[in-house]
A protein has these predicted regions:
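Conserved ABC transporter NBD signature motif
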Residues: 71-79
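ABC ATPase NBD coupling module
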Residues: 22-25, 80-96, 122, 242-247, ...
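Conserved ABC ATPase signature
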Residues: 152-156, 160
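Conserved ABC ATPase "signature" region
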Residues: 79, 130-147, 253-257
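P-loop NTP-binding/switch modules centered on Walker-like glycine-rich loops
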Residues: 178, 182, 186, 190-268
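Short catalytic/signature loops enriched in Gly
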Residues: 2-4, 18-23, 237-321
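A short, proline-enriched helix->beta-strand linker immediately N-terminal to the Walker B motif
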Residues: 171-175
């Protein structure tokens, strides 16, 4: 097996909760609590879960936009969090992030040609005379025309702005792209176009994606493997086909039951979860999902389930499986 492009081992990210004039730490928000992920070159791994499950924090911590609390993150065998700022800067172009909101991720006062080409100059990847050609290439790869280069963000639609965001990541020729809810702010018809663009770029450039989303119907079209997060922990991981055909964790089953079926005559039994997602400051003892699980037993309230292989490379953290 080839060397993994990205290895995340037992990653934890806790944010301190402070109180009083002296900002005394009184607790921690356990945004990410013992997550492990491996991505092979050319693979797309989908990370799904409700809002507040810690998906985006995983992505930001992998890119070292925020420091980890514990665990290990290796990119091409290099421990990201052990690098000095100068060493990290050298590999930054190889790892890029696509933001969720195409409206706020672009500076309204900066022409898109400058927004896309700025990183090329910052990293010294080409001369000033070559920037424009590199930007043209990135724009055209993302379905935009070269004459758009001197326009401002307000002159584009939401879908076009997201294409600009993709071009900004693509211009550095990265190997890994972390896409944080890249289609959630777009209309459904535009979502399909952007998903197809991601697939096309992966095939032509050999990109590796960590695709973060709350929508299982979106990751089904793009991802080869899927991980389901809840309250900072991984509940289940499996290949796309295995997860959709044979979901094992009650939380995964509930998420899948909410995915619309395109055939009106077919009906899926809806699993409605009770209550709200608990606070990550004081998560429940035992299985974090037991407060909302319709099948919870006494063991679920006291013992943390082991994340284990249930067969066919299908991993799940549940006492009932």
């Amino acid at each position: 097996m080839p060397e993994a492009l990205l290895e995340v081992n037992h990653l934890k990210k806790y944010f301190p909760v402070t109180k009083g004039l002296l900002n005394r730490t009184v607790g921690h928000v356990k945004a990410v609590d013992d997550i492990s992920i491996t991505l092979q070159p050319g693979e797309t791994f989908g990370l799904v879960g409700e809002s507040g499950s810690g998906k985006s924090t995983v992505g930001r911590t992998i890119l070292r936009l925020t420091d980890k609390t514990a665990g290990e993150i290796k990119f091409k065998g290099i421990d990201i969090h052990s690098l000095s700022p100068a060493e990290l800067r050298k590999i930054r172009p190889q790892m890029q992030l696509i933001f969720q909101d195409p409206y706020s991720s672009l500076n309204p006062r900066v022409r898109i040609g400058d927004a896309i080409g700025e990183a090329l100059l910052d990293h010294g990847l080409c001369s000033k005379s070559e920037v424009r050609d590199r930007v043209f290439e990135a724009l055209e790869a993302c379905g935009l025309s070269s004459y758009h280069i001197d326009r401002f963000p307000h002159e584009f639609s939401g879908g076009q702005r997201q294409r600009i965001g993709i071009a900004r990541a693509l211009v550095l020729n990265p190997e890994l792209i972390i896409a944080d809810e890249p289609v959630s702010a777009l209309d459904v018809s535009i979502q399909a176009q952007i998903i197809n663009l991601f697939s096309k770029l992966q095939q032509s450039r050999g990109l590796t994606y960590l695709f973060i989303s709350h929508d299982l119907s979106v990751v089904e079209h793009l991802c080869s493997r899927i991980g389901v997060m809840y309250l900072g922990s991984m509940m289940e991981t499996a290949s796309r086909d295995e997860l959709f055909k044979n979901p094992l964790h009650p939380y995964t089953k509930a998420l899948l039951s909410a995915v619309p079926i395109p055939i009106p005559k077919l009906k899926r039994e809806r699993i409605v979860l009770k209550g709200d997602i608990p606070s990550p400051v004081s998560p429940p003892a035992g299985c974090k999902f037991h407060t909302r699980c319709p099948y919870a037993q006494e063991v679920c309230k006291s013992e943390i389930p082991v994340f284990r292989d249930a067969g066919n490379n299908h991993f799940v953290a549940c006492h009932l499986v």
